[in-house]
Amino acid sequence: MWLDSSLQTWGPLVEVAEKQGQMLAIENVFEETPDTLLLLLSSFESPYFRFCFDTGHHNVFGKVPLSVWLEALAKYLAEVHLHDNHGEADEHLPVGEGKFDFTQFFALLSERKLSPIYTIEPHEEEHLWRGLEAVRKYLR
């Protein structure tokens, strides 16, 4: 039932994206595992329908290791939303100021030779500058 509804919702959007040469990326929000997103993405197998991994959402809601997520969805990864939290709420803290393991995350991306678009998601201006500084050390 969920998949049928999702296919009906996303199908027309994917068609438009393909015609216009624009990419759509679906983000993990409340998903505990990558299974539902993998099912949806693999149903289309479109180069214009991809995955956006949100580090903060994974830290709050993810129930399987980061490596499992990236193993399952690496071929679909187009973008990453970078922010941190303490695992209890979607705090949108700067990278490295919560409990998400960014060292492991960037190592996994490097091992798989993945180079997604990175978006820093601060909710305060000061967090932007601290976040940029923190991310620089991982992208050198």
Where are these regions (language model features)?
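Histidine-acidic metal/acid-base catalytic patches
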Residues: 19, 34-53, 58-140
